[in-house]
Amino acid sequence: MAQYPVAQVVGGQQGGVVGVVSQPSDVNLDIGGRVERMQNELDVPEQIVRDLLSVAGADIVVVADDSGSMACVANPGNYSNPMTRWDELRETLIKLAHMLLVVDHTDGFNVQFLNDPAWHELHTKQQVEALFTNRRPSGTTPLGARLQPLLNGSWHPKGHGAETDLILLVMTDGSPSDVDFAGLTRLVQAKAKNVYVTFLMCTEDDDVVGAYNRYLDRIPGVDITDDYASEKREVEAHGRKLSYYKWLAKAVLGGKLVKYDKMDEAPQSCCTVA
């Protein structure tokens, strides 16, 4: 499988990646103090911070939907602040960059759009904003072609054959255009053992979300995460709270740690995140 080019985005220009600035307040803190600082900044429980720290050695890769339907309004009922699915995708990536900086995941994450073969290595909010400058959603949803090299290990941020865990976040609002769900299921079932996948739904369309759940959610190492508004309703229906960063942490961790996959279900055991 051919290797795709890597584009590193810095302040609106391509070039070297800006280094991550460590927080001076952490210099004299022990691990407990650092975890507490991270908890306070993200407003998430200690358990989630420690789980995020536990995957610090993993590579995080995002496949982002830039098809034409992403220009649709995400929540038509929100008259005061209407946002498109594309706007919400951008905000999610900005918050992902921030969350990873807070938990000292200094590698950042790599992004590829469905209709653009270039890879983009991102570390900061400014880099995400630069990536979206003058970029508009258009085209189809070729999930099969984009996911195959990631699932089978022929493309990895550290090079072909790398053995570090790969956390793959697939952000999409529709059905694949180049393969049916049965074909997509076969691709995902054949994934390498070190690849963990979360599909983040950028839509509240019950038919689309239902198809991903029926075909893919039971595959080991795979999680389906609803959009934040829908997931928040589900979690709170079971008596829990769901902040934005808790939802985002669930997306990052859900493919690898089963307790996050079960977070929107009724409590059944001590192994479910509250």
Per-region residue spans from a language model:
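Intrinsically disordered cytoplasmic terminal tails of membrane proteins
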Residues: 1-29, 233-235, 245, 251-274
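Acidic, polar low-complexity linker/tail segments
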Residues: 16-79
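Surface-exposed acidic, glycine-flexible loop patches that form ligand/cofactor-binding
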Residues: 50-54, 99-103, 151-163, 186-189
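…and closely analogous acidic/polar surface helices at protein-protein or active-site interfaces
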Residues: 57-58, 68-108
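Structural motif
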Residues: 59-61, 164-169
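Von Willebrand factor
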Residues: 119-165, 176-179, 202-210
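Von Willebrand factor A/integrin I-like adhesion domains
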Residues: 126-132, 205-255
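VWA/integrin I-like adhesion module and closely mimicked acidic/polar interface patches used
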Residues: 138, 174-219, 223-225
